[in-house]
Amino acid sequence: MKPSVILYKKIADDLRARLDQHFTVTELDAFPSLDHPALATAEGIIGSGGKVDKDFLQHAPRLRAASTISVGYDTFNVDALNEKGVILMHTPTVLTETVADTVLALMLASARRVVEVAERVKAGEWKGGVDSDWFGTDVHHKTIGILGMGRIGLAVAQRAHFGFSMPVLYNARRHHAEAEQRFNARHCDLDTLLAESDFLCITLPLTTETHHLIGREQLAKMKPSAILINIGRGAVVDEDALTEALVKGTIQGAGLDVFVKEPLPVDSPLLDLPNVVALPHIGSATHETRYDMAACAVDNLIAALSGEVKENCVNPQVLK
């Protein structure tokens, strides 16, 4: 008898067919409510979004594996999963290059004021030659500081170094030999990163250690001409402090793909600022990469429920 699983995100037909080969699938339009009858027999879940905590696990007594179609897993209570012996799988490798592209897009859009200037053109403000009121700042040869040198940080460093001749600084728990050898990247402490970076690029996940890592004190240490880019998690940055810094000119601008609350509320003060480029968490949102992420998540669930996990496991200790 095939294991029962819940699919709570639309995926391509061929990937759905692959799930059907291995499992009895209940497909839902959204994350299952706690009283959904399918939870009682589900051995696996696959999708993105939704809060998996102790309460959820109590309503899913047979759950053995969760496969998220994402690299981030901050909506999962990993300790609770470990306690119940539930395997958590994610998709850390397939989205690296696409998210790094998004970082560069945010850097360019913020520095050259692309969104702001395009809106002015649409509003009929382009009457003739442009003066300094329309100018932006260069990206090439500026210093990029990368906070978190994982896969995405490394891909950003590659683009910055080879594409824009940018000196690369980074802050991470340990030295990254490849970044230092290939891109002449320099490991430094956080204060140095803040003080010397023209672009501060945050690629960190959200943990208890990274929550509000960048706050009012840290923003005050940045250059007035600096631009902050965040494609990690929203709560790594204190949004109130960031808003204040952008209003006061403590820093020049921000390019943001992630926020504390998503979707970003329409009354967020960040949306009123011309020096903010705000995206709807689309760092990996290309047709190609989203397909690859779903395919990876399907393979992950099959591996987890067949006892053949070799990679992409968040909590490998439960495999022992």
From Swiss-Prot:
Gene3D superfamilies: NAD(P)-binding Rossmann-like Domain
Plastid as UniProt keyword: no
Key words of the record: Cytoplasm, NAD, NADP, Oxidoreductase
Protein name, UniProt field: Glyoxylate/hydroxypyruvate reductase B
Active site annotation, chain numbering: 233, 262, 281 (proton donor)
Oxidoreductase as UniProt keyword: yes
Catalytic activity from the UniProt record: glycolate + NADP(+) = glyoxylate + NADPH + H(+); (R)-glycerate + NAD(+) = 3-hydroxypyruvate + NADH + H(+); (R)-glycerate + NADP(+) = 3-hydroxypyruvate + NADPH + H(+)
UniProt function note: Catalyzes the NADPH-dependent reduction of glyoxylate and hydroxypyruvate into glycolate and glycerate, respectively.
E.C. designation(s): 1.1.1.79, 1.1.1.81
Family: Belongs to the D-isomer specific 2-hydroxyacid dehydrogenase family. GhrB subfamily.
Localisation per UniProt entry: Cytoplasm
Protein encoded by which gene: ghrB
